[in-house]
């Protein structure tokens, strides 16, 4: 304060309040108002110095002087608060104007994703069999050689066991591999579930094929397995016909041709006749099937003289390819939007 006495009269205090009000009213933005607050309400402002000077006022006058100083400071503070509210409202209004969205402008169309056609097919197959009373079963993609080959009646020297056909997992001798088919789920299911069993398994499989128009090293299979008392090839044929009609239309029908698979006896390949989505009708090889081999049942602890079963397996990529007239299987894995658009992806 120095040696200069502070005037605590009502006139002096009123002048300090008036100066603060005028200064706050001139503030054009919040930054300017903040600077003026320091000048008029800060620790070195006239009203702050007036409060500090109360200690030098005679005791009999100090109470009245204190009330005057506090009232003046409250008036200045009120003027500041009112101007602060005004400037904040102006700022918010300006932001709303600057950031407003013109709803009359044409919108930018955002592409909408969808499920991959293989996923759509897999879900449709699952729904078809669930509606028939079957259940879903799953198994690991990294499989034990025991389940992939041994328990499925593959001889030790079968060519499918070679590294030219199968991806083995390091270290050598681990007897772990990437499953070459979904058939290992058959054995796992028979070991884990009570009979009778009616299950399908849908999943990825792996083989050392080169990627070309009709092959891919990673592909999807659907595997069906039924084990019960008294099952025959007639039950298998009926199941295949129902499956074909669900996927290819009510006119579809199947036929079977003798073949060999280690895990079924008798074994057959399945052909399906249908009217294609791009026109034309005819027979196409679809997959493999047969009655579950007695050795597979024995490996799961099931008496083949009491129970019998049938199994079938189809590739989803192949099914989608010939059902929809897709010339090149690589289109399914390369993510080209031009290919995916007809199925709803990116539409």
From Swiss-Prot:
Cofactors, names only: Mg(2+)
- InterPro entries, alphabetically? aa-tRNA-synth_II, aa-tRNA-synth_II/BPL/LPL, Phe-tRNA-synth_IIc_asu, Phe-tRNA_ligase_II_N, Phe_tRNA_ligase_alpha1_bac, Phenylalanyl-tRNA_Synthase, tRNA-bd_arm
Give the record's GO CC terms.
Answer: cytoplasm
Entry cofactor note text?
Binds 2 magnesium ions per tetramer.
The organism's superkingdom is given as: Bacteria
The region annotated as signal peptide is none
**By its UniProt entry, which CDD domains does this protein fall under?**
PheRS_alpha_core
Catalytic activity as recorded in UniProt: tRNA(Phe) + L-phenylalanine + ATP = L-phenylalanyl-tRNA(Phe) + AMP + diphosphate + H(+)
Name the residues that span the membrane: none
Q: Where in the cell is it found?
A: Cytoplasm
The UniProt entry lists the main location of this chain as cytoplasm
Question: Which Gene3D superfamilies does its entry note?
Answer: Bira Bifunctional Protein, Domain 2
For the ligand (Mg(2+)), the binding residues are: 265
GO BP terms, alphabetized: phenylalanyl-tRNA aminoacylation
Q: What's an example of a GO molecular-function annotation for this chain? A: phenylalanine-tRNA ligase activity
> Which keywords are on file for this protein?
Aminoacyl-tRNA synthetase, ATP-binding, Cytoplasm, Ligase, Magnesium, Metal-binding, Nucleotide-binding, Protein biosynthesis
- The EC category is ligase
Q: What is its EC number?
A: 6.1.1.20
Q: How does it assemble?
A: Tetramer of two alpha and two beta subunits.
Q: Which family does it belong to?
A: Belongs to the class-II aminoacyl-tRNA synthetase family. Phe-tRNA synthetase alpha subunit type 1 subfamily.
Name-wise, this protein is Phenylalanine--tRNA ligase alpha subunit
Question: What organism does the record attribute this protein to?
Answer: Mycolicibacterium paratuberculosis (strain ATCC BAA-968 / K-10)
Gene name of the record: pheS
């Amino acid at each position: 304060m120095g040696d200069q006495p502070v005037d605590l009269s009502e006139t002096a205090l009123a002048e300090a309040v008036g100066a603060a009000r005028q200064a706050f009213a001139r503030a054009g933005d919040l930054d300017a108002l903040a600077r003026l607050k320091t000048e008029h309400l800060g620790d070195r402002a006239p009203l702050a110095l007036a409060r500090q000077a109360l200690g030098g006022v005679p005791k009999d006058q100090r109470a009245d002087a204190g009330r005057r100083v506090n009232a003046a400071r409250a008036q200045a503070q009120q003027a500041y608060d009112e101007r602060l509210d005004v400037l904040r409202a102006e700022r918010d209004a300006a932001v709303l104007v600057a950031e407003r969205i013109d709803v009359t402008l044409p919108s930018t169309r955002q592409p909408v994703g969808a499920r991959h056609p293989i996923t759509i097919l897999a879900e449709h197959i699952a729904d078809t069999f669930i509606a028939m009373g079957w259940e879903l079963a799953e198994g690991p993609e990294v499989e034990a050689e025991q389940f992939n080959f041994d328990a499925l009646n593959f001889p030790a020297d079968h060519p499918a066991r070679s590294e030219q056909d199968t991806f083995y997992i390091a270290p050598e001798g681990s007897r772990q591999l990437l499953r070459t088919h979904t058939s290992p789920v058959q054995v796992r299911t028979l070991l884990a579930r009570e009979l009778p069993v009616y299950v399908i398994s849908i999943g990825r499989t792996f083989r050392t094929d080169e990627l070309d128009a009709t092959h891919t090293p990673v592909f999807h299979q659907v595997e069906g397995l039924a084990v019960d008392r008294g099952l025959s090839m007639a039950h298998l044929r009926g199941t295949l016909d129902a499956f074909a009609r669900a996927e290819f239309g009510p006119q579809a029908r199947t036929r079977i041709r003798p073949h060999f698979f280690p895990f079924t006896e008798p074994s057959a390949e399945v052909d399906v006749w249908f009217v294609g989505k791009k026109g034309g009708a005819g027979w196409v090889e679809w997959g493999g099937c047969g009655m579950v081999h007695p050795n597979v049942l024995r490996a799961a602890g099931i008496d083949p003289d009491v129970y019998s079963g049938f199994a079938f397996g189809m590739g989803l990529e192949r099914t989608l390819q010939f059902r929809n007239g897709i010339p090149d299987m690589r289109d399914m894995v390369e993510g080209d939007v031009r290919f995916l658009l007809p199925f709803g992806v990116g539409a």
